[in-house]
Amino acid sequence: MTAAVLGATAASAQNFEQYGSEAGWNIAIKEDMGPGCLMMKTNEDGTQIQMGIDATGELKGYMALYMKTPANLAKGDDFEVLFDVDGDQFEGEAIGQEIEGYKGAYVLVNNPDFIYDLAKKKQLTITPKGHRQVLVNLDGTNAAFETLRACQDAQAQ
C-alpha cells in the first residue's frame, strides 16, 4: 500500500447522503469525493473512523480518524502514521486538520481494493507518530464492506 496525504473532518461537519447501515457502520455518499462512498462509525472512546473510496480522479482508498478529545495535533501538521492490518504494516504521511472541535487526519491509498480487502481481516491498528494508537475491530464487517462496494458501484453508473 502506498499512502498519500492524511487530513480529517468531523462527520457532523461534512455533507453526507445516507446510503445504508450494516454491522454497526453507517454507509454514506460524499459528493466532494467524486462522489465517493464511505463507511463510518464511532468507537466507545469517541474516536470516529471513516473508510471508503475517493473517486475525484483515479479511484483511491480513503481512511480518516478524528476525535473530540484534546490531541497534540494542529491543522497543517505533518506526521508519520503506521497501519497494522493483522500484522502486515504500512506507513504513510498525515496532515492534521481541525474542524468544529474535532482533530484528525485522513490517508489516501493508491489501491482502492485495499479498503475492500479489510473485510477479510480481523483488526486494523492505526498509530500516528506521537499520538495514541487507535484499534478498529474488523470482525463481522463483511456486510458493511459489501454495502460500501454496492454504494460505490451505484455512483459509477
Features from the language model and the residues they span:
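N-terminal signal peptide c-region/cleavage motif recognized by signal peptidases
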Residues: 8-10
